[in-house]
Amino acid sequence: MDVRPVEEDARGIIDPATGLARFRLDRHPPSPALARFVDRHWVATWDLTGREPFTQRVLAHPVVNLVFTDGTATVHGPAAGPVGRRLDGRGWALGVMFRPAGFRSFADRPLHALIDTSLPAGEALPGGEELERAVRDLDPGDPDAVAPLLARVEDFLAALAPADPHPAEGTRDIVERVAADPTALGVADLAAREGLGVRLLQRRFADHVGPGPKSVIRRYRFYEAAERARRGTPPDWGRLAVELGFSDQAHLTREFTAVIGVPPGRYAARARAGR
């Protein structure tokens, strides 16, 4: 599986240049046994000793993350909007980022029940108490604890992974096709392209992904707009708005500002200044 470094793919990280001056983010591919379900493992490390705490805002992918930090193991469901993570002192976090719909093969509930929800691993995964015990006594300031923990997490998930195909894997493929081409596409267009009725598509997303298809399409459009904004020469915002399915530049600017916090032009200028 292709896992690109954050410098090449910062989708979901709001104002990455500012954040990456304060923490390091490494990405690792999953083992072959987990590649059907897991997109990547990520490791964040920081040392802000003697510096102001920093809150990194993210517009997370429409997926589940299993996160280990500060002695806890927590399953974070898909977030409906931006969320912030406060960093202070010295620390690390290990995350398992599942593929879209990938967590459904492990879960005992539809994923719409996990939107904007965080649960201890023991409540969200069969036998997840083992993961809570694995991280409980680790030094939260020692990044050397991450590698053996990651190996243990991989073994745990591989043992839990179903051998037979799960219906969610078809929905995963639909979402990943949207992610690869987030241009102008409505829910009805997507349903027709996939040979599904709109209501069936919506039910599959609610069960397997969490957010509905409209929200997922919108999320990937924002990623594309933010990535275009931070790279090289600022884009033609009017043309980009039409390409990504917004009615006009004003619509893109209004939606972008509501989600990201600043207009796209200002976001682009900030990104260029941070390089």
Listing of model-derived features with the role each one plays in the protein:
Residues 1-198, 208-213, 227-231, 236-247, ...:
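Alpha-helical bundle regulatory/interaction domains
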Residues 205, 217, 255-257, 268:
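DNA major-groove recognition helix of helix-turn-helix
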Residues 224, 251-252, 258:
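Hydrophobic side chains within alpha-helical segments
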